[in-house]
């Protein structure tokens, strides 16, 4: 994919977001992860829309309780035990959101997320972060600190033109 040319060799983390729910960010992040895995890259997709996890439905995961929130709540948890292989491709792995916590923003602000990403970088060629809509909550802005590249999803005849102002502001501020 063209995204590979936008990243340096040591850059592995791609954040996918949108302005509001329903624009297709989970669809795009899932297909991006699948495409990279079909190129022979070892890829993990991380469900960081922890208020409204979408990866469980996309990948038909049965164990919805185990995921990144367990690690963020308790960094003593073995992160790699929470990563699940996918049925799609041997190179594709999924780290779902897990149980919806009472304090999502607080969990994402802690340095546990930074440690999780560093651990995943040791095991995977690419880390795709499926995040919450940026126009709804501040979670994605907090997650942005660990990303090397952001993909902003806009859906034709769905994303309002006024929301493009937010996209331009975020780009200008390099967030």
Each predicted region: which residue ranges?
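P-loop NTP-binding module
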Residues: 1-175
């Amino acid at each position: 994919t063209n995204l590979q040319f936008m990243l340096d060799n040591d850059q592995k983390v791609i954040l996918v977001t949108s302005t509001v729910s329903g624009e297709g960010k989970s669809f795009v992040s899932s297909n991006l992860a699948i495409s990279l895995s079909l190129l022979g890259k070892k890829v993990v997709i991380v469900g960081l829309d922890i208020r409204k996890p979408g990866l469980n439905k996309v990948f038909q995961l049965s164990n919805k309780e185990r995921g990144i929130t367990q690690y963020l709540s308790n960094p003593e948890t073995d992160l790699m035990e929470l990563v699940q292989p996918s049925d799609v491709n041997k190179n594709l792995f999924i780290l779902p959101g897990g149980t919806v916590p009472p304090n999502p923003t607080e969990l994402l602000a802690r340095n546990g997320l930074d440690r999780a990403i560093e651990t995943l970088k040791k095991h995977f060629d690419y880390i795709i972060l499926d995040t919450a809509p940026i126009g709804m909550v501040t979670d994605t802005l907090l997650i942005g600190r660990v990303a090397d590249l952001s993909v902003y999803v806009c859906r034709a005849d769905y994303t309002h033109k006024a929301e493009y102002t937010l996209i331009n502001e975020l780009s200008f501020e390099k967030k």
